[in-house]
A protein has these predicted regions:
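Short amphipathic beta-strand/extended segments with alternating polar/hydrophobic composition
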Residues: 1, 120-121, 137
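Short beta-strand-to-coil "C-cap" segments at the C-terminal boundary of structured domains/repeats
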Residues: 3, 130-132
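Extracellular/periplasmic head regions of type IV pilus-like filament subunits
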Residues: 26-116, 121-124, 131
Length: 137
C-alpha cells in the first residue's frame, strides 16, 4: 500500500482554497437572503451593505469583518464589485433608494506564491475557478 503525502505548502494552499470557496459561497448566500428579504430583488452594492443591521434588530447578512469591498483573509484577496445600480427602493437596513445593484461579482486571488487557483462568483451563484485571474462577470 502506498501512502501519498502532501508537502506542507501545498496542504496549506488547499486549506486556503477551501476557505476562499467557503467565503464566496457565504457571500452568495448573504446576497440571496438580502435580495429576497430586504432589497426588493436588488443586490447589495457593497460588502458594507451586507453587514448593516436591519431596522428590525436582526443580524446583518454578513459578519462585520467583511465590511470592506477588498479584504484579505486566509491567504486570499477578495474584491467585491457591484454591477449596475437600478431604480431600487430603500432597503430594510438603511441603504438609500437607487443604491442597490442589479448584479454583483466577487473575486478571490491568492496572495501567496503557493496559491495556484483563482476563484470568482456572481449573482448566478456558481463559483468559478481558474489558474489565472477571473474577469468580472
Amino acid at each position: 500500500m502506498t501512502v501519498s503525502r502532501l508537502e506542507p505548502s501545498r496542504a496549506r494552499a488547499i486549506a486556503f482554497e477551501t476557505s476562499a470557496v467557503g467565503i464566496l459561497r457565504t457571500v452568495n448566500s448573504a446576497q440571496a437572503t438580502f435580495t429576497a428579504s430586504c432589497a426588493s430583488g436588488f443586490y447589495a452594492s457593497s460588502m458594507l451593505d451586507l453587514t448593516r443591521l436591519p431596522a428590525d434588530g436582526s443580524d446583518g447578512y454578513m459578519s462585520p469583518e467583511f465590511n470592506l469591498n477588498t479584504i484579505y483573509k486566509s491567504g486570499y484577496r477578495f474584491r467585491f464589485r457591484p454591477g449596475l445600480r437600478g431604480a431600487s427602493p430603500a432597503t430594510c437596513n438603511g441603504v438609500q433608494p437607487g443604491r442597490s445593484a442589479t448584479t454583483y461579482y466577487i473575486g478571490a486571488e491568492p496572495e501567496l506564491a503557493d496559491g495556484r487557483r483563482f476563484f470568482g462568483t456572481n449573482q448566478g451563484g456558481t463559483v468559478y475557478q481558474s489558474s489565472s485571474r477571473i474577469q468580472d462577470t
